[in-house]
């Protein structure tokens, strides 16, 4: 819905160039149609992640952009991947209870949190990095600490260079430790590139649905909760649950 009027209208109101957003989406739509897998970013992503899950047990797919501006994009991907691929039945109606678990992260913040788990925890994850490779508005670290040997080497670099070095180092560390990862590189982060990313991930989800043999366009798993909510709120035609207490409940009382 992000590229439909539901998403485009509020984006335009907030100052986003909707035409550029759609232009980027159209660009991704074109190259994601090619039958040559090596030239189809969406198809390649879906295939690699499905193989990692089905053959290697890597059921957790981590999207980790190295940009604070893409933090919300990670959460958008989490919603897209989860609601589209987590299904009880395959296309033939067989009970399968399948689907990968998406996990949002952001660099460099999660290098000092989740990467510990990615490096040394269960071999059940694939990390998908998003790297900004072009020239961005950047800040030079500066040489005002040149007299301090432990940080003097940073004087000729920028914060962007430092972040990118940390991203490349993290990817290499994961690789050396046998942890699967892939990287999408974008030159800049603007409306056109964002539209391209939205479309690329959306098409990858459709391809993944075919590989998992599920319908990625329905969301039956959320319907029961909606209907029970209607019943609890008194909507006509809907009944509240017979019991409202959870199986286990802890109550924290004020002292």
Give, region by region, the residue ranges found by the protein language model:
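Short secondary-structure boundary micro-motifs
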Residues: 37, 45-47, 156-157, 167-168, ...
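Helicase-primase coupling helices
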Residues: 97, 103-189
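Extended, charge-enriched "interface" segments that sit outside catalytic cores
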Residues: 143-154, 211, 242-255
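N-proximal short alpha-helices
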Residues: 43-46, 50, 54, 143, ...
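Active-site phosphate/pyrophosphate-binding segments
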Residues: 1-128, 133-137, 221-255
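Glycine- and acidic
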Residues: 29-32, 58-66, 95-100, 149-156, ...
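Short alpha-helices
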Residues: 1-26, 161, 165-168, 179-227
